[in-house]
A protein has these predicted regions:
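Nucleotide donor/acceptor-binding cores
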Residues: 14-17, 118
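Carboxylate- and glycine-rich phosphate/diphosphate-binding segment that chelates Mg2+/Mn2+
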Residues: 136-208
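Single conserved hydrophobic/aromatic residue that forms the stacking wall/gate
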Residues: 1-6, 10
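Short glycine-rich or small-residue beta-strand-to-loop segments that form or flank ligand, phosphate
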Residues: 17-22, 47-50, 76-79
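Glycine-rich phosphate/diphosphate-binding loop of Rossmann-like nucleotide-binding domains
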Residues: 18-38
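Short beta->alpha junction loops
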Residues: 48-58
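Glycine/threonine-rich beta-strand-loop-alpha-helix active-site module
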Residues: 59-162
Length: 208
């Protein structure tokens, strides 16, 4: 799946990719090195933004966006769990619109059109958040002690890779936590006031 993702990125005329990752599991299990190798093999220049913390902060988003402005990628690739993918989504907005404030980013469905500078690929290593296919991102302002949702279809990834090889590296505790997270999302979908005849059977099947 990783090699096909690199090929897909290259076919979309990608020349420079920034990979955003978290605390080290992607590197420890060799997936980060594989992704870098596949992208370089496809003729792309690659730069890393590492160390994205769980529940990513506003400060991390701003640092990542600054790194993107310097490197000028045409592809942003987020690898790992929900945190690096959420952080990279927010960095993407700030990269495309350097003048935008965090407060403006948090206006629901208020993000201006993206993809002027870069497209987005999410490679998920966990089963819980499904942020690789959603229009949402959660960023924490630790000074205020508040988690802010960013909600806009503009930040839905262009490419989502769900490779079982990555999920197999999860420790048992994380498997349990993300499994409950996935079930919670299924229950939320079923009881949501925005449900419909199409989503209800999917939600029930997911719960089972």
């Amino acid at each position: 799946a990783l090699s096909s993702a690199a090929s897909d990125v290259y076919k979309r005329q990608g020349k420079k990719a920034m990979i955003c990752v978290g605390g080290g599991s992607m590197k420890r299990f060799g997936f980060l090195d594989r992704a870098v190798a596949y992208l370089k093999e496809a003729g792309m220049e690659v730069e890393l933004f590492e160390g994205i913390e769980p529940d990513p902060s506003v400060e991390t988003v701003m640092r990542g966006a600054e790194a993107m402005l310097k490197f000028e990628p045409d592809w942003i690739i987020a690898m790992g769990g929900g945190s690096p993918i959420d952080a990279a989504k927010a960095m993407w907005i700030k990269y495309e619109y350097p003048e935008i404030t965090f407060e403006e980013m948090c206006k629901v469905f208020g993000i201006p059109p993206l993809r002027r500078k870069a497209h987005f690929c999410a490679i998920s290593s966990t089963s819980g958040t499904a942020t690789e296919v959603t229009a949402f991102s959660i960023i924490t302002d630790y000074q205020k002690g508040i988690k802010y949702p960013i909600a806009d279809f503009e930040i839905t990834p262009d490419v989502a890779i769900v490779d079982p090889d990555l999920a197999e590296t999860m420790p048992k505790k994380l498997v349990a936590h993300t499994g409950m997270d996935a079930m919670t999302h299924a229950i939320e979908a079923y009881v949501s006031t925005a449900n419909c005849d199409f989503t209800d059977p999917l939600a029930l099947h997911a719960i089972k």
